[in-house]
């Protein structure tokens, strides 16, 4: 089973054996912490590779340069921010308001050879300069755009969304101007990757 997972990641995302071993360490660390603080639901932890690793790493399909600054909002258990960092994104900022989750992220960040900064604060309190914003399971699109109005985002947002994506886009367009592209998630037929440029 693990060999098949490695082969998939290696063929599709050029994941080395060393990087794959870091993902396995990530699973062990997450399992340990999840017993004391609720980072992910127990059912999704059982499906760690598809639900969390594949779901996060697929964003690399829409990132064409790893030498960038990525701001990951509401990082929680580190998806997708930590996964992208372990996969070679040079500079990742993890933003998490919950101090317990930020403590977990501090440990998870040690698995990466790249630069990771952890900011334990609310998104709306920050002025962040980055190339790309990533978001997974945080808030509706209108809230995300409102909370990041003071950000300087050079390129785009990549937001993992579920089946209500169209309603969220319609509502957000009432108060915001942006262009968007939708991509089907490779992990779930009812999930989408929303690419936004403002």
From Swiss-Prot:
Pfam families in the cross-refs: GidB
Keywords, in A-Z order: Cytoplasm, Methyltransferase, rRNA processing, S-adenosyl-L-methionine, Transferase
Xref: Gene3D superfamilies: Vaccinia Virus protein VP39 (3.40.50.150)
Domain of life: Bacteria
Primary site of residence: cytoplasm
GO CC list: cytosol
Record: residues binding S-adenosyl-L-methionine: 74, 79, 123-124, 136
Manganese is among the record's keywords: no
Entry keyword annotation includes Cytoplasm: yes
Disulfide bonds listed in the record: none
E.C. no: 2.1.1.170
Enzyme category, top tier: transferase
Molecular function terms, GO-annotated: rRNA (guanine-N7-)-methyltransferase activity
Catalytic activity reported: guanosine(527) in 16S rRNA + S-adenosyl-L-methionine = N(7)-methylguanosine(527) in 16S rRNA + S-adenosyl-L-homocysteine
Compartment(s) where it occurs, according to its Swiss-Prot or TrEMBL record: Cytoplasm
UniProt family annotation: Belongs to the methyltransferase superfamily. RNA methyltransferase RsmG family.
Free-text function comment from the UniProt entry: Specifically methylates the N7 position of guanine in position 527 of 16S rRNA.
Protein name (record): Ribosomal RNA small subunit methyltransferase G
